[in-house]
Amino acid sequence: VRVLDSSPIQLKGYGYEWAKHNATRRCEGLKLHVEYDLGLESPTRVALSFPNFNDSSMGKQWPIETDIIYVFDKGYCDYDWWWSIHQKKAFFVSRLKVNAAISIEQKFETNENSPILEDGLFRFSNPKPRGGKKNLYTSLARRISVQREDKDPLILVTNLLDEPAEMIAQLYKSRWEIELFFKWIKQRLKIKKFLGKSENAVKIQLITAIIAYLLVFLFKNSHNQTTPLYLMLVWIKCNLEKPVLFNAFYLDKKPMSPEVKYLLETKT
């Protein structure tokens, strides 16, 4: 399962004048796009753009892999792109716009005790939804209405026609994992303050932060560590000038050689 989303990087004030030309009401700066693998708990693709670059346009630039389930929000609403996902034997789960023109083909029974309010198959009834642009998605799709506390029902759309509706709702709920990732890197890797103010300087610092995350993540997984990623990051920051101390993470699992023991005793 892969989750697609973006997060704004606000850049305002003296030195960031270059960011004003492509600003939106929501953001003046850059936008960080990420494809996040829920199984690996790690990003698989990362890109930067200006805020006025649509999320769906970035999604179109990334390759679609067979048998992968892609989860994304309404920012990626593009019927033709959804069709390309379907054609490549991949799957998607997203939100359906309230004003989407559809015709219901079949309704499924729902359990009274389930949060699933409605479940059924439909077709898009508008052949040209965007000012004359032909809608390529002509196959059946699935519409699921999910109850939410103190909010309007969540309307989901997917090409997973046979899976339980509850599972599909849970897949969309798991999209928040990528929000936690964005929050983690912004807080832990200090990408709210930048060393330089030029466009290249900001982009380099952002990409460097992602690389740092991936390196620590790979180190943690390759050594079967249970230490939280943040604690490992702090430990590494405090010992950048003592590379031999990286062995401290797994010295208890291997016999300590006399050379390593000597270095640890003399360099710490």
Located regions from the model:
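Single, function-defining residue in the core of a domain
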Residues: 1-268
